[in-house]
Amino acid sequence: MNKEIIEVFDNTYPDRDYTIEIINPEFTSVCPKTGLPDFGTITVNYVPDKSCIELKSLKYYFLEFRNAGIFYENITNRILDDLVEACQPRRMTVKTEWNARGGITETVTVSYSKSKE
């Protein structure tokens, strides 16, 4: 997955804490064990610092996963790491909710918080 695709723009209100929620209800990847497609919803909540994520570039970043064989847990952590690196938010949470396979669903949530220096 090419994280260089992710673009950001300047936050006009860097002195204010506010939350941005981004939802992608059509995320797809491939199960690395079976080769079958996985479908899920990705929710990103973050409090920006100096920059915000540009949505068109994020869409193309998410499409990078479409043919990738990768486990749910790895997808969730990879997205968090890549988005934190791109926009350096104050706080961010990535939640992935996966459609049922064999009658079982899975939700993975991972968070980041910028340390006070």
Swiss-Prot record:
Supply the Gene3D superfamilies for this chain: 3.30.1130.10
An annotated GO cellular component: cytoplasm
Q: What is its EC number?
A: 1.7.1.13
Q: Which sites are catalytic?
A: 31 (thioimide intermediate), 38 (proton donor)
> Record's superkingdom?
Bacteria
Q: Catalysed reaction per UniProt?
A: 7-aminomethyl-7-carbaguanine + 2 NADP(+) = 7-cyano-7-deazaguanine + 2 NADPH + 3 H(+)
- Where in the cell is the protein located? Cytoplasm
- Please name the InterPro entries in this protein's record: GTP-CH-I_C/QueF (IPR043133), NADPH_dep_7-cyano-7-deazaG_red (IPR050084), QueF (IPR029500), QueF_type1 (IPR016856)
A GO term (biological process) for this protein?
tRNA modification
Give UniProt keywords alphabetically.
Cytoplasm, NADP, Oxidoreductase, Queuosine biosynthesis
- List of residues binding substrate: 53-55, 72-73
Major location (coarse): cytoplasm
- One Pfam family name from the record? QueF
Its transmembrane ranges are none
| Pathway where it operates | tRNA modification; tRNA-queuosine biosynthesis
GO MF, one term, reads:
preQ1 synthase activity
Role of this protein: Catalyzes the NADPH-dependent reduction of 7-cyano-7-deazaguanine (preQ0) to 7-aminomethyl-7-deazaguanine (preQ1).
Q: State the family it belongs to.
A: Belongs to the GTP cyclohydrolase I family. QueF type 1 subfamily.
NCBIfam families, A to Z: QueF-II (TIGR03139)
The protein's name: NADPH-dependent 7-cyano-7-deazaguanine reductase
Lineage from the top down? Answer: Bacteria, Pseudomonadati, Chlorobiota, Chlorobiia, Chlorobiales
| Gene name of the record | queF
